[in-house]
């Protein structure tokens, strides 16, 4: 059965994303897959298949799929910078929900080191969105795709997370926003809902939905639900912020 034919029938329990409630996540994901199936097939399903940043990886981030607008010069920088990145410190299947910022020298800290390997040396016009779209393909359960839309959508929650974490870990008190932690808290708070969502998608009879249920991370499903919670076009200008 096709995606459109199953949309009206699917139902799963509500999930909150950055304080916004998606009342029928299964329908929202089916709608996303209907509208952006090419992105899922040509970008998401290539995640975790690369051992290094390559030309093929960069091409997957560009239009018509993710619209990263990474130039040839920037692509060369990503590829070169990737050769010295600390990939070995982070398992391929690392999950954001395990990246507790209060755990010193834990997954959060290792992910931050990997992020900063690119962030601290970035050339002009390479900022949060471009880096996150590349790192997502290398570690899809860990790095959110922080384009300008998702950054704005999570801003209030990220500020609250920063205040809370900063009060408990002095080394992180300097940050005004912690987007990773805000998203991580939503994943932890929605584990049951996400599990049911996967079960529903897996029984739709729609091949793309069934593959999505098996292959997409909780992080990416939540990203898709963010669009359903507050639909609209993102500002196309990448924002230069540190998202961790």
State each model region's role.
Residues 1-122, 140-244:
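An N-terminal alpha-helical hairpin/helix-loop-helix interaction module that forms a charged
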Residues 111, 131-132:
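Short linear interaction motifs
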Residues 132-138:
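Hydrophobic, aromatic-enriched interface-forming segments
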